[in-house]
Amino acid sequence: MNKRDYMNTSVQEPPLDYSFRSIHVIQDLVNEEPRTGLRPLKRSKSGKSLTQSLWLNNNVLNDLRDFNQVASQLLEHPENLAWIDLSFNDLTSIDPVLTTFFNLSVLYLHGNSIQRLGEVNKLAVLPRLRSLTLHGNPMEEEKGYRQYVLCTLSRITTFDFAGVTKADRTTAEVWKRMNIKPKKAWIKRNTL
């Protein structure tokens, strides 16, 4: 199967689903059997999954150490991951490893322990990210939570399972002008 055929078929493939497995560390995925759904997973000749979705929700992960290596062991084309579900784990930050998946369009991080709203800045490099969840994290309690995320990630069309409207965008822009100070340009003055 060539790469173009793979891209056309894997979008409809069921996810590689490791949800509700009490997984503590990413490396455990290699020895764990994924959950089975109504449709069987398609595999490559090498035995790797032909999907673009990886579900790790409802586990006890507190970091994503070795995520890239494990994804490469499980998926035929890990670089094509489009959907990662890490909801309901024990993550305290947004691991930069997630920013290496440039085809990521759906990222679920709700129900974790992410404290700092500034963690969202890391996701700004993902050009295809359209759907993001962060509710149920301590950061949700910060003033301007929704507006900050929408300002930082202007391509998002769905946030916390709600569509982003034009009014949301306008409110976020007004909030940004009122709350985020622009960086001042330093001008070196000539000394005579």
UniProtKB/Swiss-Prot annotation:
Pfam families: LRR_9. It is found in: Cytoplasm. GO terms for cellular component: axoneme. The keyword S-adenosyl-L-methionine does not apply. Disulfide bonds: none annotated. Its main location: cytoplasm. Keywords: Cytoplasm, Leucine-rich repeat, Repeat. LRR repeats lie at residues 49-71, 80-101, 103-124. The keyword Repeat applies. Residues 137-175 form the LRRCT domain. LRRC51 and TOMT were originally considered as alternative reading frames, LRTOMT1 and LRTOMT2 of the same LRTOMT gene in primates. This is Leucine-rich repeat-containing protein 51. It comes from Pan troglodytes (Chimpanzee).
